Amino acid sequence: MTVFSALLLAGVLSALALAVGGAVGMRLTSRVVEQRQRVATEWSGITVSQMLQCIVTLMPLGAAVVDTHRDVVYLNERAKELGLVRDRQLDDQAWRAARQALGGEDVEFDLSPRKRSATGRSGLSVHGHARLLSEEDRRFAVVFVHDQSDYARMEAARRDFVANVSHELKTPVGAMALLAEALLASADDSETVRRFAEKVLIEANRLGDMVAELIELSRLQGAERLPNMTDVDVDTIVSEAISRHKVAADNADIEVRTDAPSNLRVLGDQTLLVTALANLVSNAIAYSPRGSLVSISRRRRGANIEIAVTDRGIGIAPEDQERVFERFFRGDKARSRATGGSGLGLAIVKHVAANHDGTIRVWSKPGTGSTFTLALPALIEAYHDDERPEQAREPELRSNRSQREEELSR
């Protein structure tokens, strides 16, 4: 190949390379242009400024910008809801924090209680933070506030719980300490030792029951799903709950009466359901006069199975009926302590019901008695209308007479 031919070939190859490169470059350039046009089209509906405005408006924090004269130059709706700004006036505590922020400090504060109540939302716990808006322009401070009410309520509940547990544990522990001292002082008297030892055992059992109930309540209040959900026979639940307290009923000469077997079924944790119903039976026995009747009934009502426990006891005052399911709540404290209960039984019932997507409700009249009704979703079974068992048709055949009246009339 001559030098001329070689140069000619090199020139052709170079030309081809340039042509291909140009084509590719044009294609890439057109793609970039198309992409930019598409992005521009997508953003044409909202500007960055509008987007930021939407974010500030919708965020759960209250925000306000204030100048050195206490004039509020910007705020979002949440700032008014939380009491940071009212009638364009910054909260007193917030303004004190803002003045420090204008001096270059970052300040945390709590809103004034007076301002929070003025918003009509009592019980709010609002925490705030103030800082300089910009180092370049020191005329403005920005103040943020957020609602800490849930956290404050949780902390209050935790403190109450610790205080209640400490108080409840102090009684059996103190009793056991005194009994132990008495035992040491009576070591030579076998009869006295035996009597005090029996009392120590009673207090130890009470303490053990309380700890077990605390553990159970803690587990029920957790977020985990119940692990042992099975097809549960309601009649079995009733029988086991009664058997747990047969001795206590016999000792108090109380008859525990039930209606006929129902063949009703629910989906649930059998152990927890028995525990819940047993707690209701235990309460009914404990608060009933000697020689009275405690009755248990079960029925299907719509999509639910209802198990009702009725006593003819002292009843519950109307002002206490909403609180009986709280931990450690006792209406008649003297009577409650005499029964030896921990004050946790009904709280456990409430959480067992909630974990089964059910409910627990109470009807009571002082001097007449009480009915606690545990309602649980019925087990769904595929029956044709003409093949449903008698129990499934019960709501259609049963009279409208209330279950409570039926139980109390027995």
Curated annotation (Swiss-Prot):
UniProt-listed Enzyme Commission number(s): 2.7.13.3
| Membrane topology, as annotated | Multi-pass membrane protein
Function, as annotated, reads:
Member of the two-component regulatory system SenX3/RegX3 involved in stress response. Autophosphorylates, and then transfers the phosphate group to RegX3. The system is involved in phosphate starvation response. Plays a role in modulating expression of aerobic response and in the regulation of response to hypoxia. Involved in virulence. SenX3 is a key regulator of mycobacterial replication in response to oxygen, nitric oxide (NO) and carbon monoxide (CO), and acts as an O(2) sensor that plays an important role in the reactivation of growth in response to the restoration of aerobic conditions.
The biological process GO terms on file are: cellular detoxification; phosphorelay signal transduction system
Q: What is the lineage of its organism?
A: Bacteria, Bacillati, Actinomycetota, Actinomycetes, Mycobacteriales
Region ranges (Disordered): 385-410
Q: What is its main location?
A: membrane
Keyword terms? ATP-binding, Cell membrane, Kinase, Membrane, Nucleotide-binding, Phosphoprotein, Stress response, Transferase, Transmembrane, Transmembrane helix, Two-component regulatory system, Virulence
Q: What is this protein called?
A: Sensor-like histidine kinase SenX3
Consequence of gene disruption: The senX3-regX3 deletion mutant shows a growth defect after infection of macrophages and is attenuated in both immunodeficient and immunocompetent mice.
Explain the induction of this protein. Part of the senX3-regX3 operon. The two genes are separated by a rather long intercistronic region composed of a class of duplicated sequences named mycobacterial interspersed repetitive units (MIRUs). Significantly up-regulated after 28 days of hypoxia.
Swiss-Prot/TrEMBL catalytic activity: ATP + protein L-histidine = ADP + protein N-phospho-L-histidine
Its top-level enzyme class, in one word, is: transferase
Query: One GO term of the cellular component aspect?
Result: extracellular region
Q: Which SMART domains match?
A: HATPase_c (SM00387), HisKA (SM00388)
Does the keyword Phosphoprotein belong to this entry?
Answer: yes
Post-translational modification as stated in the protein's UniProt record: Autophosphorylated.
Q: Which residues form the Histidine kinase domain?
A: 164-380
Q: Which residues cross the membrane?
A: 6-26, 46-66
